[in-house]
Regions:
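Conserved beta3 VAIK motif of the Hanks protein kinase fold
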Residues: 125
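Charged, structured surface patches that assemble and position nucleic-acid processing machinery
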Residues: 173-181
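Catalytic cores of nucleic-acid endonucleases
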Residues: 105, 129-174
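A broadly conserved detector of short glycine/acidic/proline-rich loop/turn motifs that flank catalytic sites
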Residues: 50, 70-71, 120, 128-129, ...
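Accessory nucleic acid-recognition modules appended to NTPase machines
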Residues: 1-122
Length: 181
């Protein structure tokens, strides 16, 4: 379940409930123990949610990211429909490999995929498979609208066309992965 839901918000309660629906009784503390074992085995990372306005890490609504996207494929036979989650997982692993501390950003009404910090450096990142219509473009670029600071903000997608707007920088996935950021 954890591997198959990389880049999705999880909780011990939701996993216990999902297993209970399949007649597999397990308690939330047991689920959290197993998540910790999976983390300790370097199969996945649990990423804290960070309240951007309150400037503090939150102890709930974390996301799990698999450390190797190959694991993701083990539990997903419909990977084509999951490109957005896979790209988010790849970007997370890239940020970690470059030495960033990574959080999920929580705004008043939404979420920013990543807050990346390394020393005094900080930036925000949204990941989308394709910016294929105006609704998706507005959603991805609009995720930054409630962030009052002036740290750099990026949208990463597979698109080759540059769609930078309102000071938010758009980057192609490959260009982002090959950059120092």
């Amino acid at each position: 379940y954890v591997i198959g839901n990389s880049s999705v918000t999880i909780s011990g309660n939701s996993i216990a409930a999902a297993l209970s629906d399949k007649n597999q009784k397990v308690s939330s503390p047991t689920v959290y123990d197993f998540i910790k074992y999976i983390e300790d085995a370097c199969i996945c990372d649990k990423v804290a949610r960070y309240d951007i306005r309150g400037k503090k890490a939150l102890a709930f609504q974390e996301k799990i990211y698999v450390c190797d996207p190959g694991f993701y494929r083990l539990k997903k036979n419909r990977i084509k429909s999951e490109y957005g989650h896979l790209m988010e997982t790849i970007c997370y692993n890239d940020l970690i490999s470059k030495g960033y501390k990574v959080f999920i950003g929580k705004t008043l009404t939404g979420e920013v995929d990543f807050i990346a910090e390394r020393g005094a450096e900080k930036f925000y990142l949204q990941v989308a498979y394709l910016l294929s219509d105006e609704h998706i473009i507005d959603r991805e670029f609009g995720a930054f609208s409630e962030i009052p600071d002036h740290y750099p903000k990026y949208v990463v997608s597979r698109d080759r066309t540059t769609l930078t707007r309102d000071g938010i920088i758009h980057k192609n996935l490959v260009d982002f992965l090959l950059s120092d950021e």
